[in-house]
Amino acid sequence: MGEARELLQERYTSVSSLDLISVSRRKMGAVLSTKKATKMGVDEVEVVESCMVAPCQETPRRGMWLSPLDLMLVNRGHTPAVYFYPYRSEPGDFFDVARLKAAMAKALVAFYPMAGRLGMDGNGRAEIDCTGQGALFVVARSDLTIDDFRSFLPSPELRTLFVPRVEDHSPSILCAVQVTFLKCGGVALGTALHHVAVDAISAFHFLQTWSAFSRGGGGAALELPFHDRTLLRARSPPLVHPDAFSAFCPKLNLSVEPSETVVTQAFVVSKDQVTALKRACVGGDGGRVSTFCALSAHVWRCVCVARRLPPDATTRLTFPASVRRSMRPPLPPGYCGNGIIWLGAAGKVRDVTSSESEDLVFVAGQISSAVRRMDDELVRSAIDYFELTEIDSKPAPGRMPETELRVISWLGMPVYDVDFGWGKPLAMLRAVSERAGFVYLMDNGKEDGSVRVLMSTEAAILNDFQHLLYARF
């Protein structure tokens, strides 16, 4: 580890070697975790470089039309995420900044909209202005270590420390990254990609491409992004099927009451436990159910019980689903943009929590039915609906009703495939937690079939939820 620290000191001995643009400090006055409370009260991150990385070749200069599924998210801003990489002495030049910039410049040739800016067309409709100005690239250093974040849980402090502050430059920037060299020799890579430009699938595609160029060998084997978003244009005239409303646009009234204390905790469900849940979801008919449906059904039931919801209340689980394979014809491979609509499953609390349906068949069936409903007509109806209504996607203040649960699945996505040549990340997570009632499902990164369940909920029910989550195993 001494070698790592010497490398870090050598790398920053000369400010001129970094082509320094600006230096600033972010003082952290909050405690990041109880484990390190005595050490981390006044830690800081020092930004030593901030610049724009432009595509290394000429790219199209044009206004890129945004689909209704993109416009839904125009006010959501940037999605903050952090990757942690432990120090590795081989193959040398750990997280070499020049190498990362060169790889970014290559990736932005294919993903040229990410080098543009959010703008408006002549009619006042949001679009991506493909200017080629580049992505924001920040380099920083910190006396913190990866061990200070071993719980790998999202927090406002995590975002402040490691995710680039796009608002300090221009909110119209679509792509920003920050490479923070830590005292232990490791690196925290923070990303801020604007949701109007990419959903999770497209974001991981971009990061995979960037990291592949950094590893070397050229990009011949990489899948190119597909940029024609007019494939998701509304029909003329728009037509919304009556049965589609309950599937993709359920009304939600947020409470204006002060929010309770919200905590975020990670739970690991082993491969054997996932298998047991999937068996419980199909009963004796020998059918099959996805890991997403099985885990979502179990978590939904546990939350309803932990919250002690009235038996007659209607509870609802909503989740984002990709439209890419549901359309006819399917969207081309590598479609870059937002290809997500939200679906919902609902039921009476007594049915979701009934002890007589311990096999979870009913609950999983409700979720599976919602998934099966998504066909070309449902997707087209959703696109037409969002074109007609022009919904403001800015997150509303307030808290969700206790009867609501939202599950976002990153299962099967290449979350840990962002390898720049120095190994895969030790952990990846969103840098901020959601309001109570949000759950993220993702592979645990151990390559053992286990799943990480990241739960944001009211502090008062956390212990009950944990007990219920594991009680059936």
Where do the model's predicted regions map?
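Short, surface-exposed beta-strand/loop micro-motifs that present aromatic residues
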Residues: 72, 174-180, 436-444
